[in-house]
């Protein structure tokens, strides 16, 4: 899977042996399928949230209007963000498209630091950056 995940698991084992609470949250570990287009996700799926009885809202957007994706000739793809309906906290990020193996890090950061969709929407990045900004605006 991921070398970084294996490293974190090793640290978690050492923490547990030392009587500490392991720091790793497996919900925040990204999954990536290196195909063309790439597929990546982190956090909960809609099915998991429904099974847990969590009320959520969903935002989706595509790469069709993204200048960088258009310049790359890879404007096909979509991003879906799931957020708690009451708190707006991001619960899951799912995507397919160009370089989403890198873009998923934005979702990992949001989950790790309990960000809301509004928190992510307020971040300003360079214009031609592939990101989930438009998706959280849809929430």
What is each of the regions a protein language model found here?
Residues 132-139:
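Single conserved hydrophobic/aromatic residue that forms the stacking wall/gate
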Residues 21-22, 56-57, 136:
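Secondary-structure boundary/capping signal
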Residues 1, 5, 9, 102-105:
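An amphipathic alpha-helix/helix-turn recognition signal
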């Amino acid at each position: 899977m991921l070398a970084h995940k294996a490293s974190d698991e090793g640290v978690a084992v050492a923490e547990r042996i030392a009587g500490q609470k392991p720091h790793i949250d497996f919900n925040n570990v990204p999954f990536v399928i290196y195909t063309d287009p790439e597929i990546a996700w982190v956090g909960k799926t809609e099915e998991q949230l429904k099974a847990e009885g969590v009320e959520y809202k969903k935002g989706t957007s595509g790469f069709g209007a993204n200048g960088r994706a258009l310049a790359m000739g890879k404007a096909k793809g979509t991003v879906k963000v799931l957020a708690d309906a009451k708190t707006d906290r991001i619960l899951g990020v799912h995507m397919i498209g160009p370089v989403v193996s890198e873009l998923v890090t934005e979702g990992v950061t949001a989950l790790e630091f309990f960000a809301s969709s509004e928190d992510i929407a307020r971040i300003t990045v360079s214009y031609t950056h592939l990101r989930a900004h438009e998706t959280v605006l849809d929430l």
